[in-house]
Amino acid sequence: MEDRIQKAVELFKSGYNCSQSVVAAFADMYGFTQEQALRMSASFGGGIGRMRETCGAACGMFLVAGLETGATEATDREGKAANYALVQELAEEFKKRNGSMICAELLGLKKPEGSSVPEARTEQYYAKRPCAKMVEEAAQIWVEYLEKQMI
C-alpha cells in the first residue's frame, strides 16, 4: 500500500492536480482506468476548480471513500449514513494532521486568487506550496483506513 502513497505524490509532481493524484493512485482497486480516474477527479483540484475551498487532495480521498463505501440504492439510508460517517472521520483526521481542509487556509492565502489558470509547476511552485504533502497525507490516511479493514 505504501507504493500507492508514493504513486499519488509522483502523479502530483508530474503535473496532475491534487485530487487527480489521490484518485488515480487507487483507481484500479475500484475497476477504473487511470484516464477515468483523472477525468472524474479533474474538477476538484485547487480547492474545487481553483476556488480554494475544500482541499482537492481531501476531495480525492472522499471520492475514493465513496467508491469503497458509497450507497448505490436511493433508499439505503444506512449505507448513506455509513459513508457519511466515514467521510467525517477522514475529514477529522485530515484536519488533525494539517490544521484545516480548506485550500486557502492550507496555502496561507488571505483572498482568492481569482484565476482559473493553474500556475506553472516549477521548483518555486513546489517549494512554496504544501500540496504535495497534502496529497501524501490524504493517500496515507486512506491507506491507514484500508489497512484497518484488513485486520
What are these regions (language model features)?
Residues 1-14:
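Polybasic, low-complexity association/targeting segments
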Residues 12-15, 26, 30, 48, ...:
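Structural signal for hydrophobic packing residues in well-ordered secondary-structure cores
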Residues 16, 44-63:
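Glycine/serine-rich anion-binding loops at beta->alpha junctions
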Residues 25-43, 112-116:
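Acidic-glycine-rich active-site phosphate/pyrophosphate-binding loop
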Residues 29-39, 65-86, 150:
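Phosphate-handling active-site elements
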Residues 52, 78-79, 94-95:
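RNase III-family endoribonuclease catalytic core
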Residues 83-151:
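C-terminal binding/interaction regions
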